[in-house]
Amino acid sequence: MGRKWNNIKEKKAAKDKNTSRIYAKFGREIYVAAKQGEPDPELNQALKFVLERAKTYNVPKAIIERAIEKAKGGSDETFDELRYEGFGPSGSMVIVDALTNNVNRTASEVRAAFGKNGGNMGVSGSVAYMFDQTAIIGVQGKTEEDVLELLMEADLDVRDLVQEDEVTIVYAEPDQFHAVQEAFKQTGVEEFVVAEISMIPQTEVSLSQEDQEQFEKLIDVLEDLEDVQQVYHNVDLGE
């Protein structure tokens, strides 16, 4: 599963060029989570999860507070959570998660992104069955043995444990996300290199250079769409 960590790491490296876009996406996600439940993360697991993710992207406190205050203030702006599935060059698979206040606009933009970059939209379920929803939590400063021990003490049986680039990564069930984080926090860990719930492909495919260039453009175009929150795929980009 190490390659999946590489994909997230590449996204984090790229964010330096797109901080305003990343922050805007988090602002929307935090607002939606706070609006759908209590604006207190200790009483709202969805909000708590988004805030933990936001920390790993260094989202400024002011943006977080503004989004929560907007939700508290009774804003009537509503967003729909949507998932689109589709295919890129050579049958590569793509999942697009969006938060939108205009479903028709988002569907049109996502469809155009696929169509102009060697892909096409699929029906619901055409791609997702080839991915596993997985909690991914990574820390520095602990060995695999350290992490295995703390997980055992917390009575947590996770999917996988990988050490890579001085980062120890835990792959767990989605509903274990907070329990794994809490197990780390009990040992004094306060910062996480990665804290995500991601869609991990069961198998990856490699593309020709030409197809990969087109595929990377497709992903870039999708990620640049204002309403798109996450893009998952099954291509080994070889990075």
Curated annotation (Swiss-Prot):
Keyword line: Cytoplasm, DNA-binding, Transcription, Transcription regulation
InterPro entries (UniProt xref): Integrase-like_N, TACO1_YebC-like_2nd/3rd_dom, TACO1_YebC_N, Transcrip_reg_TACO1-like, Transcrip_reg_TACO1-like_dom3, Transcrip_reg_TACO1_YeeN, YebC-like
SUPFAM superfamilies cross-referenced by the UniProt entry: YebC-like
Highest taxon in the source lineage: Bacteria
Subcellular location: Cytoplasm
GO molecular function, one term: DNA binding
GO biological process: regulation of DNA-templated transcription
Pfam families cross-referenced by the UniProt entry: TACO1_YebC_N, Transcrip_reg
Chain segments annotated as coiled-coil in the UniProt record: none
GO cellular component: cytosol
HAMAP family (UniProt xref): Transcrip_reg_TACO1, Transcrip_reg_TACO1_YeeN
Entry's family note: Belongs to the TACO1 family. YeeN subfamily.
Name the UniProt record assigns to this protein: Probable transcriptional regulatory protein BH3259
Species assigned in the record: Halalkalibacterium halodurans (strain ATCC BAA-125 / DSM 18197 / FERM 7344 / JCM 9153 / C-125) (Bacillus halodurans)
Organism lineage string: Bacteria, Bacillati, Bacillota, Bacilli, Bacillales
